[in-house]
């Protein structure tokens, strides 16, 4: 079976492991984008520490779970968003105002929609977490 979307697979793996009550999860294959999304999730308190393990192939991320993720998913297709449009997409993907984050890939790196709004930059929506 081929893996079509590694980011969506990683986020659903995290969500399912949280629901079962696991304390850690191994995500493979690893990529720079998955690592950046994990960093944003860690900065916002959704996951604990994570580390990259080199297995001689694409690599593996070991992620400590804190039990704070209700749902995490990739946004397909990756919509382009202007700085003024974040509220519209917040209503579409997040369950309530100021609850959860949208992960945005911008020209200045991967960040939350709140950080991008403060900086006044747009980007592409890649994931949501709440």
Curated annotation (Swiss-Prot):
The keyword Ribonucleoprotein applies. InterPro entries: Ribosomal_uS8, Ribosomal_uS8_CS, Ribosomal_uS8_sf. GO terms for molecular function: rRNA binding; structural constituent of ribosome. The keyword rRNA-binding applies. It comes from Thermococcus sibiricus (strain DSM 12597 / MM 739). The lineage of its organism: Archaea, Methanobacteriati, Methanobacteriota, Thermococci, Thermococcales. Pfam families: Ribosomal_S8. GO terms for cellular component: ribonucleoprotein complex; ribosome. It comes from the Archaea. This is Small ribosomal subunit protein uS8.
């Amino acid at each position: 079976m081929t893996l079509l979307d590694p980011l969506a697979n990683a986020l659903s793996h995290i969500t399912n492991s949280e629901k079962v009550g696991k304390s850690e999860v191994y995500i493979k294959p690893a990529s720079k984008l998955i690592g950046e999304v994990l960093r944003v999730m860690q900065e916002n308190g959704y996951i604990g520490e994570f580390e990259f393990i080199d297995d001689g192939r694409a690599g593996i991320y070991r992620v400590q779970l804190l039990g704070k993720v209700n749902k995490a998913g990739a946004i397909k297709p990756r919509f382009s968003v202007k700085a003024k449009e974040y509220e519209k997409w917040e209503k579409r993907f997040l369950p309530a105002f100021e609850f959860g984050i949208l992960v945005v890939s911008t020209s200045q790196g991967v960040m939350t929609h709140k950080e991008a709004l403060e900086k006044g930059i747009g980007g592409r929506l890649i994931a949501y977490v709440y």
